């Protein structure tokens, strides 16, 4: 899960052009285990922005190092808030989904976030 947060942080801080704090990581769908010696790929994509926060979809894939295709391992969502030098929230640029795939991903990510908040 640390790699999930690391990839999410890298994506969020690049979009925010500065430091961020992790607000939420959840909605994890564990598909299969990572085996010892597997090559692991972690990919984070922006799915939504609010005034100071960013929602991301994070996907983990793994497979053998000898050319076997990578397979899905985990899908989850994460929310980060951009902060200034005093750790106060600061505004981020707006992002809007443009492709049908981006729109569908944004809707799925938001549904996971809403469900997790409702369960609290």
Predicted regions and their residues:
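A eukaryote-biased signal for short, well-structured alpha-helical docking elements
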Residues: 5-7
């Amino acid at each position: 899960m640390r790699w999930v947060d690391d990839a999410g942080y890298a994506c969020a801080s690049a979009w925010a052009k500065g430091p961020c704090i992790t607000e939420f990581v959840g909605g994890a769908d564990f598909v299969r285990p990572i085996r010892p010696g597997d090559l692991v790929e972690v990919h984070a994509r922006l799915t939504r922005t609010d005034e100071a926060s960013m929602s991301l979809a994070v996907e983990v894939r793994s497979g053998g190092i000898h050319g076997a295709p990578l397979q899905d391992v985990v899908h989850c969502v994460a929310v980060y808030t951009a902060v200034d030098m005093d750790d106060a929230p600061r505004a981020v640029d707006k992002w809007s989904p443009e492709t049908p795939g981006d729109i569908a991903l944004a809707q799925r990510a938001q549904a996971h976030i809403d469900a997790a908040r409702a369960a609290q």
